[in-house]
Amino acid sequence: MFEHYLSLFVKAVFVENMALAFFLGMCTFLAVSKKISSAIGLGIAVVVVLTITVPVNNLILTYLLSEGALTWTGLEGASNIDLSFLGLLSYIGVIAALVQILEMFLDKFVPALYNALGVFLPLITVNCAILGASLFMVERSYDFGESVIYGAGAGVGWALAITALAGIREKLKYSDVPASLQGLGITFITVGLMSLGFMSFSGIQL
């Protein structure tokens, strides 16, 4: 069991990295990766959100939305009820609620990070990496334990990628980059090279 969870975690971090394998969450990934401090802060926020939302959405799917999930209520005909069509709406609602709570927490206790992240903190709500993790969980039929590990791994992988990109971009400020590639141009090339590097993990077998 431990080996299975370890394999799932490593796979989520390196082999199926949300940012560098699936290119999810690119908006905030590119916008907040100019400074390492901001990148780490947003990365931690994404880890927290993913670690909580994926298993919570798993519980919602298991006990409310999937066909026959409402049998525990004892209602007549509950075994035939299928609310899975509400999945997308439910997942987004959970993500939005958690991000709102996180935003209030940072505003109260870590105002410097809250101001540094600015508009990109509430944008975590529509970060497709967050929703994508929940949809992958559904597609792959993960149980609750696997959902916790996968959510944490996906968050750590995204945080690792944005922190690494931020470190490279800080170094690029002191490099002689051609004028036509300055800004997002060289950033896209950097992300592509990082993605190629992470592809080398695809052969890992645990």
UniProtKB/Swiss-Prot annotation:
Q: Which UniProt keywords apply?
A: Cell inner membrane, Cell membrane, Ion transport, Membrane, NAD, Sodium, Sodium transport, Translocase, Transmembrane, Transmembrane helix, Transport, Ubiquinone
Q: Does the keyword Transport apply?
A: yes
Q: Where in the cell is it found?
A: Cell inner membrane
Q: Where are the transmembrane segments?
A: 12-32, 36-56, 85-105, 118-138, 148-168, 184-204
Q: Which reaction does it catalyse?
A: a ubiquinone + n Na(+)(in) + NADH + H(+) = a ubiquinol + n Na(+)(out) + NAD(+)
Q: Which InterPro entries match?
A: NqrDE/RnfAE, NqrDE/RnfAE_oxidrdctase, NqrE
- Topology with respect to the bilayer: Multi-pass membrane protein
Instruction: Cite the EC number.
Output: 7.2.1.1
Q: What does this protein do?
A: NQR complex catalyzes the reduction of ubiquinone-1 to ubiquinol by two successive reactions, coupled with the transport of Na(+) ions from the cytoplasm to the periplasm. NqrA to NqrE are probably involved in the second step, the conversion of ubisemiquinone to ubiquinol.
Q: Which family does it belong to?
A: Belongs to the NqrDE/RnfAE family.
- PANTHER family (alphabetical): INTEGRAL MEMBRANE PROTEIN OF SOXR-REDUCING COMPLEX (PTHR30335), NA(+)-TRANSLOCATING NADH-QUINONE REDUCTASE SUBUNIT E (PTHR30335:SF1)
Q: Which named protein is this?
A: Na(+)-translocating NADH-quinone reductase subunit E
Q: What is the lineage of its organism?
A: Bacteria, Pseudomonadati, Pseudomonadota, Gammaproteobacteria, Oceanospirillales
- State the gene name recorded for this protein: nqrE
